[in-house]
Regions:
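Negatively charged
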Residues: 2-194
Length: 194
């Protein structure tokens, strides 16, 4: 029997290449995301220990709120399993450099997308560059889309396919974006709430 430390480096590196980070809680995931986003050196060390962020297994996570909020981040996470996530509140808030595809995420269980791509304002007048298709998203369970794309000035993708019949809050959903208001059926009940 070999101890891992007594194996040749080539074998250890091969074993590590199969390691996939599988966080059990939001706290675990948030901690490693923070390590990933500190700087390039930290990203390299985090990649060595946890594997590349694009390969992380997020199937156990139900809450991704604030996950990348205020971080400098633009890596591919399109293959993340988000099918159990219910909360994406402020997930990419103030992540001004993020512009990666997310169109094939299964967001069918998400109820909260409040400020998901929101960009804060201030003396620097920064704006999000996010402009990726999201037309394949099933948002039929979302209740809150308040400020979802507010400040995402580049976002101009069609969302006409979205079923927003359960949304109760769309305040400033497209504030300061160039997005045309989608052709959605919105009930009088929803208009009264908006």
């Amino acid at each position: 029997m070999y101890l891992l430390t007594s194996l040749p480096d080539a074998i250890i590196n091969k074993i590590k290449s199969y390691v996939v980070f599988c966080p059990m809680t939001k706290k675990n995931l948030k901690y490693v995301v923070a390590l990933w986003c500190i700087n390039e050196n930290s990203k390299i060390e985090t990649c060595k220990k946890y594997g590349h962020i694009s390969l992380w297994n997020t199937e156990n996570i139900t809450d991704m709120s604030y996950l990348f909020s205020n971080f400098r981040f633009n890596d591919d996470i399109s293959k993340w399993n988000v099918s159990n996530v219910t909360n994406m509140n402020r997930m990419f808030r103030s992540t001004k450099s993020f512009n990666q595809p997310l169109n094939y995420w299964d967001v069918s269980n998400v109820t909260n997308m409040n400020s998901m791509f929101y960009m804060t304002f201030g003396k620097y007048k920064a704006h999000s560059i996010f402009n990726q298709p999201l037309d394949k998203w099933n948002v039929s369970n979302v209740i809150n889309m308040n400020d979802m794309f507010c400040g995402a000035k580049k976002f101009n993708q069609s969302l006409n396919n979205w079923n927003v019949s359960n949304v109760r809050n769309m305040d400033r959903m497209f504030g300061l974006s160039i997005q045309q208001v989608p052709k959605w059926y919105i009930s009088k009940k929803q208009i009264d709430i908006i």
